[in-house]
Amino acid sequence: MGNSFRSDRVAVEIQREINDILRNKVRDPRVQDVNITDVQLTGDLSQATVYYSLLSNLASDNEKAATALKKATGLFKSELAKRMTIFKIPDLTFAKDESVEYGSKIDELLRGLNNKSEY
């Protein structure tokens, strides 16, 4: 139970730091519209899945962003090591957060239902 609280705190800190690193350190234009939405850590803090969303819905932009994030993983880990006081920085895996697109699709459907009911 104590590990869960600690891993949640570390996950929030990693999310905040990676967002800051993206904005201030990474100069790659492919990650310009990337926003880190969540970080999930394993109980032993050795693996972190970093979920991100994009402002663009184009598949090519998604591939480019995924490639750029994977390429910048070393930079993220070294910057996290400088900024955080944990013993070992977790291995980072990036995954696209599909919940943002899913939520906007549901919102669009609900708006469509509202428009139909008004007529």
Swiss-Prot record:
GO CC, any one term: cytosol
GO MF entry, a single one: ribosomal small subunit binding
Protein's cellular compartments: Cytoplasm
Keywords, comma-separated and alphabetical: Cytoplasm, Ribosome biogenesis
Keyword Cytoplasm carried by entry: yes
Domain of life: Bacteria
Main location group: cytoplasm
One GO term of the biological process aspect: maturation of SSU-rRNA
Physiological role: One of several proteins that assist in the late maturation steps of the functional core of the 30S ribosomal subunit. Associates with free 30S ribosomal subunits (but not with 30S subunits that are part of 70S ribosomes or polysomes). Required for efficient processing of 16S rRNA. May interact with the 5'-terminal helix region of 16S rRNA.
Self-association state and partner proteins as the record states: Monomer. Binds 30S ribosomal subunits, but not 50S ribosomal subunits or 70S ribosomes.
NCBIfam families: rbfA
Family assignment from sequence similarity: Belongs to the RbfA family.
Protein name: Ribosome-binding factor A
Organism: Lactococcus lactis subsp. lactis (strain IL1403) (Streptococcus lactis)
Taxonomic path: Bacteria, Bacillati, Bacillota, Bacilli, Lactobacillales
